[in-house]
């Protein structure tokens, strides 16, 4: 991106490639709006600034930065350097590209380095929402600066209609032109390497054949080819692992020859020159003292079996020529060339070296020396049975005089067999024989040059008795690879185990709430959780009251306790710096959310309806309900208009039963309270499941003044076997609506879909949770919890079609995420989002920008009473935590064998995998059934907040509607929950995603194998593709092998080779049983991998029953590691939800591409401010209004008696 500009610097030139995005066409078209917005933003005050500065402060900070960096002159530029992340080029692959694009249209620019935001150049501040206000002169409807209550002018109806029609025509033309441009690009765009590979690997299946097999669409054929390409890669990885496991040693080491250890050669063999020969079936021709056909091993008077007969076939006249010469008067035959017939007397000796020199002559001179050509040829044709080897310990035997040369073992005592009357030998031979220091030593280095080398070679030819026990280079390499792999795998297994224990014992307690309404004894609480988790419909245990206001002693100090170097996140406490938790409410502690003194209601239980308002609302009047209107720290973008007037059902009206906000210092659980949204996404769930889910959320011990239930129904769906549709079921669980349910209208919004389905409509219902007449929760324990229901009803065009309004769970999440982004950035919003804004205001009395965290729960999940408190405590205690999850327990453990095999799998995935990842703050999968995300986080100076879940980069990528590749479909259609976790880590790799074991929920898992098969198909495929995304993120914790990126890579490879791994495991076990010797190392490794989780159970679970669940899991390993992955890989191109979610119309076939064209002119988008002005205009025309008080604001009435 372009570098931050100094005051007075000229605008970047068009030819500057680093400034291209600043001069985009979108920005040039809005140039005339920049100055206009700058004026208004400069005049509007801001209480708690999310990411906004005052002009004067920004200018001062910018000048300070220049001075600190030693740069002189307004026109100086920073030099580009690789050491500054904020100076890197920001293109669409940058993790904060969209955030930069959004924030450049605001008065400040963001920082990704931890510094406070830096101001951009003058004239850079503008807003996306200004496009809806492109009016000039006298006919302009609204003004963007000043008081919004000033008289308003309207355009004539004819002009407005004409302008609207013109806008629709322009939109249609632009869409058609864009579609044609995309089609042209598709035709000329070169295929990617991956597409080319898939086409090559599937050349044998042309398109016309695939069409015959039920793939008429190009997208289907493309997905099938990509599937085959992925399967081929999986097979290659599996083959590589198999080769490394079994084939590498055989390839580089080969089949080792048969080797016989010295002193263990049996009497069936004779040894010649260090090799053993099997002579048990041999016969000897007739010779002196040897009858014809006799066996030399047993038939002769002297038994030669097991002896060394090297002197029978001596190697002469080779390297020893001219070293060993004929003595004077010798009887050894020789020729004219000086060749000798033998060197030693031709006698055998014992293999253990115990024979004494024998210089006698039997029968005749040269008897048994085998000097004839026939004898030599017969010997050379013999095949040796194997080498005779010595270990290094054998060479150090004190009873023998052994040395080693070039791998050959030499018996120096055999030099005593020389007959001085027959031959002469070098004196070096005697020196070596008499030197005790050479015993058991390798003489190769000592005898390596010149004459000494000849001596060593000569000795190897005449006194070699065997070979040293050594491996080839290939065998050594294979052993190195084996042991390195063993150490590597063991290190991963052991480190994961140890770190999981460390997290359980020491780290996890830091994130938990100091106290909750549950029993403080951990054993008692664990037992309560286990009992509660055994039945899906069992309510949580009774809660105790811990609503004690936390106040610190505030003594005035004569000396200053802070300085300009003090952190805004710490407060002085007796000379020590104590960390101060930061929330939206705590930052406004000097001006409370609810004006007035602390009332006695805060001393009562916050979850008791009697302390705040009765179930019928009788204890609250209108004045009290408006107590939350005066939000001194609230952003002026919203607060000004809200305080102006209160038309029933619109933005200014607050429900009479709204729950008063406690003062910020009220900390019932030892940490500042943060406002939370509890998102429950529904599809086809039944009444009983939804009821228990909402009951569990409503009955959590977290104060109901700081939690709001938000239910989103994904279409007009009726579950299988249900009497009512899911929206009707949910609406029957809401009471005291702001607007009567039959009067609620549908509003448009931009859905996550393609074609005409991109336009969708939804209804917004706001009220309070209704426990029902037959509730199992006693009335005195029922809390009054704000509730909002969004029903995606669909457009009129799809009213008669199947599942109107259904766009998927991701679309439901995007409705909320996009809304929060637009609230935080003050962007244009749809009519649906405006109604959501008003609905939240009306039932809570606070602005939606006060919400900091979102709890995401599926409609079939039940939450333990203190789980929400523990999760929010972790968020408040550590601002770096951007996401977390709790433990999911199985409620139907004993329903069938299918549920039984899942119990331990759930346990180990949390307490080992997620616990290990939490140590580094990089949990790769936050399950969508029970997780929490941070909407925004404090950063930098006081009152500075940066978007996290509401970040444009997260929202933009998560709302991707063009899903045209196999990879994208597996990410966005099957595993959207896991992809959201991936997006968060990819966008904010330095922040944390953790596991909070104190937060617990329960759910029902599939009890039929086909349902489990369908569920795991989606999970495994999405896991593979999400790991492919995460393995490319290089900024995660750690470096090289000691990093989360490396752990993710290992996990990806491990997931891909699961079928091959279980096959190899069975092979090793069976091979160890059948063949000897037993392969010890693989068995030890297997025992450690499977046994350590059992130790983890004993240490962390404290219940023996989980050991039994582990044994059941081990018996089902073929299902987990072979059946499920193999089925999933073959179904890579199946994007339906299968048997997991069934409706009255049958199985869910997924969300296919929408037909037709998207007409954006049907969706009205304005800033909240503009919507509110429209409402006021309608109020003025209807003649309704409230008499303003002093200063133009309505008269404020203190609910606590103050004035």
UniProtKB/Swiss-Prot annotation:
CDD domains: Chitin_synth_C. GO terms for cellular component: cell septum; cellular bud neck; chitosome; incipient cellular bud site; plasma membrane; prospore membrane. Keywords: Cell membrane, Glycoprotein, Glycosyltransferase, Membrane, Transferase, Transmembrane, Transmembrane helix. Its EC number is 2.4.1.16. The keyword Lyase does not apply. It is an enzyme of class 2 (transferase). Residues 1-182, 604-632, 1182-1203 are annotated as: Disordered. PANTHER family: CHITIN SYNTHASE, CHITIN SYNTHASE 3. This is Chitin synthase D. It comes from Aspergillus niger (strain ATCC MYA-4892 / CBS 513.88 / FGSC A1513).
